[in-house]
């Protein structure tokens, strides 16, 4: 069963020892990180988005993940921190003019240069192939190399001119230390947003519960600041409106009571300048009065009987 014909077996062929740890090819790892989607493992195609930890995704893959969060997907752990589409930023990438794409090696008789990248830094011109550190801004989504950020120190984006802070700078495909720092920043940012939302809710409730002071609560009379001509016209209109009301109230009061108003003197018809025929209609006229001889003493009468 072997070992014949002068063959000498070696020790490693007969004795099984511990397996050596397989070393990952760095070039292959860089190609996978910078050219393929972290979630779907497909080639990156526009629109390309990045999360708060600096990982690259296809936007349609992120939308599908958010719509169907099934536990069976093993790759869902890579995007478990993405709760909504607001947690990712669409990147503004600059194309590499030297990139030929799939047209460069259609026959398969040429060597594929893995160091050639699809995108470059718009400021310095470095290729985004993983050999150089790249970052993007959360506020605008512009992508440029870290060297450009260090060489040209400014508080404004180098490409679009938008203002940014140090917290907005996120390293793409960084090391474990970079990911830890970005994770702590992400947690602090989300906690801060929750606290702000909680403080806004009671303020909104108070504004709804409190009534409008101008409508219900009585306050001082408002002084109209306008021209004197307009003020005089308003006062005249008010007087004319109040005059008929006062006359109507006087008529109604006099009609109900049947008495002259207070302070008015009683007017006798005998003193008036009317004719004698008109005066004779009333009991106060001399023709309506009788002497004591003409009237019986035992009959009580009034002047209305005559």
Swiss-Prot record:
Residues 226-240 have a biased composition (Basic and acidic residues). Residues 193-306 are annotated as: Disordered. Undergoes proteasomal degradation, via DDI1 and DDI2. Removal from stalled replisomes and degradation are required for genome stability. InterPro entries: Rtf2, Rtf2_RING-finger. One of its GO terms (cellular component) is replication fork. One of its GO terms (molecular function) is DNA binding. The modification Phosphoserine is found at residue 287. It comes from the Eukaryota. Its main location: nucleus. Interacts with DDI2; probably also interacts with DDI1. Replication termination factor which is a component of the elongating replisome. Required for ATR pathway signaling upon DNA damage and has a positive activity during DNA replication. Might function to facilitate fork pausing at replication fork barriers like the rDNA. May be globally required to stimulate ATR signaling after the fork stalls or encounters a lesion. Interacts with nascent DNA. This is Replication termination factor 2. It comes from Pongo abelii (Sumatran orangutan). The gene is RTF2.
